[in-house]
Amino acid sequence: MVAWLWKVLMGVGLFALTHAAFSAAQHRSHARLTEKKYEPLPADIVLQTLLAFALTCYGVVHTAGDFRDRDATSELKDMTFDTLRNRPSFYVFHRSGYRLFQRPDSTHSSNLSASSSDLPLKF
């Protein structure tokens, strides 16, 4: 089919989905005014919501077009072994618990030592 037809179909689906949401909000407001607490949504609103969602999904899938094939061998053929296994997000330059493992005779004093016991932590 023509590409613009899928976009129109998606637009109609989004409009119908918006209308169904507005109808559900109006129904809830009406139920609150009439003090009916547990009244379910009417079947026409539920049906309109489901059909509008299906129509929107169908339009989105066809508007997006075909998937592009990804060939990993073409991207990986120029990489060396060192480049392939390089993960900079795993580099650690500063540990957050470095004060737990320092020696008791170190010159740096911790702010927590005044409130904690005088025994050093050893692991």
Curated annotation (Swiss-Prot):
Principal cellular location given in the protein's record: Golgi
MF GO annotations: cobalt ion transmembrane transporter activity; copper ion transmembrane transporter activity; inorganic cation transmembrane transporter activity; magnesium ion transmembrane transporter activity; manganese ion transmembrane transporter activity; nickel cation transmembrane transporter activity
Induction section of the entry: Up-regulated by low extracellular Mg(2+).
NADP is among the record's keywords: no
Subcellular location: Golgi apparatus membrane; Early endosome membrane
Transmembrane feature ranges: 2-22, 41-61
Classification of source organism: Eukaryota, Metazoa, Chordata, Craniata, Vertebrata
Protein name: Membrane magnesium transporter 2
Regions of this protein lying in the Lumenal compartment: 23-40
Tissues where this protein is expressed: High expression levels in brain and kidney with lower levels in heart, colon and liver. Very low levels in intestine. In kidney, highest levels in distal convoluted tubule.
Keyword tags: Endosome, Golgi apparatus, Magnesium, Membrane, Transmembrane, Transmembrane helix, Transport
Compositionally biased spans, kind Low complexity: 107-117
Family from the record: Belongs to the membrane magnesium transporter (TC 1.A.67) family.
GO CC terms: early endosome; early endosome membrane; Golgi apparatus; Golgi membrane; plasma membrane
Region (Disordered): 102-123
Signal sequence residues: none
Record's function text: Mediates Mg(2+) transport.
Gene Ontology biological process terms in this record: cobalt ion transport; copper ion transport; magnesium ion transport; manganese ion transport; monoatomic cation transport; nickel cation transport
Membrane topology: Multi-pass membrane protein
Topological domain spans for side Cytoplasmic: 1, 62-123
Organism superkingdom: Eukaryota
Pfam families associated with the record: MMgT
